[in-house]
């Protein structure tokens, strides 16, 4: 449930 595009790769 992350809005960050970078963290979205993991989460």
Curated annotation (Swiss-Prot):
Stated family: Belongs to the NPY family.
Annotated compartments: Secreted
Coarse class of the protein's main subcellular location: secreted
The keyword Transcription belongs to this UniProt entry's keyword annotation: no
Name of the protein this chain belongs to: Short neuropeptide F
Expressing tissues: Both forms widely expressed in the nervous system. Expressed in corpora cardiaca, corpora allata, hypocerebral ganglion, frontal ganglion, frontal connectives, recurrent nerve, esophageal nerves, protocerebrum, pars intercerebralis, antennal lobe, tritocerebrum, circumesophageal connectives, subesophageal ganglion, thoracic ganglia and abdominal ganglia. Not detected in abdominal perisympathetic organs (at protein level).
Modified residues (Phenylalanine amide): 11
Top-level taxon of origin: Eukaryota
């Amino acid at each position: 449930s992350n809005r960050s595009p970078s963290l979205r790769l993991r989460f």
